[in-house]
């Protein structure tokens, strides 16, 4: 589960300006953290198919945000991929 402190830390490291909480970079970083958490969860709980479906939904949402960012600004896209270490 993504606790408030961790979420705030992610927002601070990826924000574009002081009051930024919803830019694509911030959203992608938060989704990536949730994906990492769920991946670790499935190593222990292999039969949790309900949450696995949620993971697939989150991955799709992140993919759509990345596609949007790639169309909008390629440099920002490359920077976020590099910073998060996402394979694309």
Swiss-Prot record:
CDD domains: Ribosomal_S15p_S13e. SUPFAM superfamilies: S15/NS1 RNA-binding domain (SSF47060). One of its GO terms (molecular function) is rRNA binding. The keyword Ribonucleoprotein applies. Keywords: Ribonucleoprotein, Ribosomal protein, RNA-binding, rRNA-binding. Gene3D superfamilies: 6.10.250.3130, S15/NS1, RNA-binding. Belongs to the universal ribosomal protein uS15 family. One of the primary rRNA binding proteins, it binds directly to 16S rRNA where it helps nucleate assembly of the platform of the 30S subunit by binding and bridging several RNA helices of the 16S rRNA. Forms an intersubunit bridge (bridge B4) with the 23S rRNA of the 50S subunit in the ribosome. Part of the 30S ribosomal subunit. Forms a bridge to the 50S subunit in the 70S ribosome, contacting the 23S rRNA. This is Small ribosomal subunit protein uS15.
């Amino acid at each position: 589960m993504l606790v408030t402190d961790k979420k705030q830390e992610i927002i601070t490291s990826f924000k574009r300006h002081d009051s930024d909480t919803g830019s694509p970079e911030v959203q992608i970083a938060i989704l990536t953290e949730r994906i990492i958490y769920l991946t670790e969860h499935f190593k222990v709980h292999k039969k949790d198919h309900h949450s696995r479906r949620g993971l697939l939904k989150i991955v799709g949402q992140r993919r759509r945000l990345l596609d949007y960012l790639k169309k909008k600004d390629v440099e920002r896209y490359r920077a976020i991929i590099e910073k998060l270490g996402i394979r694309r």
